[in-house]
Swiss-Prot record:
Tissue spec. comment: Expressed by the venom gland.
Protein's name in the database: Dermonecrotic toxin LapSicTox-alphaII1
Any one Gene Ontology cellular component term annotated for this protein: extracellular region
Sorted UniProt keywords: Cytolysis, Dermonecrotic toxin, Disulfide bond, Hemolysis, Lipid degradation, Lipid metabolism, Lyase, Magnesium, Metal-binding, Secreted, Toxin
Enzyme class: lyase
GO biological process: killing of cells of another organism; lipid catabolic process
Primary role: Dermonecrotic toxins cleave the phosphodiester linkage between the phosphate and headgroup of certain phospholipids (sphingolipid and lysolipid substrates), forming an alcohol (often choline) and a cyclic phosphate. This toxin acts on sphingomyelin (SM). It may also act on ceramide phosphoethanolamine (CPE), lysophosphatidylcholine (LPC) and lysophosphatidylethanolamine (LPE), but not on lysophosphatidylserine (LPS), and lysophosphatidylglycerol (LPG). It acts by transphosphatidylation, releasing exclusively cyclic phosphate products as second products.
Annotated source species: Loxosceles apachea
A GO MF term: toxin activity
UniProt binding sites for Mg(2+): 25, 27, 85
EC number: 4.6.1.-
Recorded catalytic activity of this chain's protein: an N-(acyl)-sphingosylphosphocholine = an N-(acyl)-sphingosyl-1,3-cyclic phosphate + choline; an N-(acyl)-sphingosylphosphoethanolamine = an N-(acyl)-sphingosyl-1,3-cyclic phosphate + ethanolamine; a 1-acyl-sn-glycero-3-phosphocholine = a 1-acyl-sn-glycero-2,3-cyclic phosphate + choline; a 1-acyl-sn-glycero-3-phosphoethanolamine = a 1-acyl-sn-glycero-2,3-cyclic phosphate + ethanolamine
């Protein structure tokens, strides 16, 4: 998975897909009542990037729908996976459930079109930066189930993004009954280098049949860092430069070991190859 980083403006969707991304990540900000309001990162952010792009969440979700709705003029066949980087650290722990409810309501209305019409092809990863906000997952799932559309949860996965100890992450999932559809991230801003020790631990847990199905690292922009991540057998690399990763994947060491995920690949099934 080539995961385009910090795609917070609608026009950037086309830009990152054109560079080779089959997945994009964006930042979701909440107001004091736990309503998701807009996509926005703010400063500081990654080196050599503009931090200030934003869209209102309703507009952004509608744009995501257009890009993953077969038959729509903007449909992008190779755009498969969306990572919702939730900025919930501004919220109290007690607001996590409500944040999950309200996020689900927005996605259901604006991306899934209230469960009506032709289904969209995108998959979602709900990425949470605080282990204490595990109830956000519960609020999200219960809201979708209450709308009578359990099948939509087949297209939703989860991630805790704060580089916590892997056993602590697993315990958080146990508290809300999550046993699959788990992506595990590991990383830091591209301005700072980070080793792959924890990422390799997550890969071992994935391959050992644990709750983790996929592992991705962020934010990786240099050729050698991408090679190192691929050598660690991660499933995805989040980058500001998808085109560089496209080039690396064509190298002799990787062209037969990896292929780009397509829209017929389930991003929540552990790859066995």
């Amino acid at each position: 998975w080539i995961m385009g980083h910090m795609v917070n403006a609608i026009y950037q969707i086309q830009e990152f897909v054109s560079l080779g991304a089959n997945s994009i990540e964006f930042d979701i900000n909440f107001d004091t009542d736990a309503n998701p309001i807009y996509t926005y990162h703010g400063v500081p952010c990654d080196c050599f990037r503009s931090c200030l792009h934003y869209e209102y969440i309703s507009d952004f979700l509608k744009a995501l729908r257009e890009h993953t709705l077969p038959g729509n003029p903007k449909y992008k066949e190779n755009l498969v996976l969306f990572v919702f980087d939730l900025k919930t650290n501004s919220l109290y722990d007690s607001q996590a459930y409500t944040a999950g409810q309200k996020l689900a309501e927005n996605i259901f209305q604006y991306y899934w079109a209230n469960g009506e019409g032709m289904p969209v092809s995108g998959y979602l990863v709900i990425s949470i930066p605080n282990l204490q906000h595990y109830d956000l997952i519960k609020g999200f799932r219960e809201t979708i189930k209450a709308k009578g559309h359990n099948e939509l949860l087949d297209r939703v996965g989860y991630d805790f993004s704060a580089n916590d100890n892997i056993p602590d992450v697993e315990n958080a999932y146990k508290k809300v009954g999550v046993v699959n559809h788990v992506w595990q991230s590991d990383g830091i801003t591209n301005c700072i280098s980070r080793g792959l020790t924890r990422a390799k631990e997550a890969v071992s847990e994935r391959d050992g049949g644990g709750v983790i199905n996929k592992v991705y690292v962020w934010t990786i922009d240099k050729y050698q860092s991408m090679r190192d991540a691929l050598d660690a057998n991660v499933d995805g690399i989040m980058t500001n430069y998808p085109n560089i990763l496209v080039e690396v994947l064509k190298e002799d060491a990787y062209k037969d070991r990896f292929r780009l995920a397509k829209n017929y690949d389930d991003p929540f099934v552990t790859f066995e190859g």
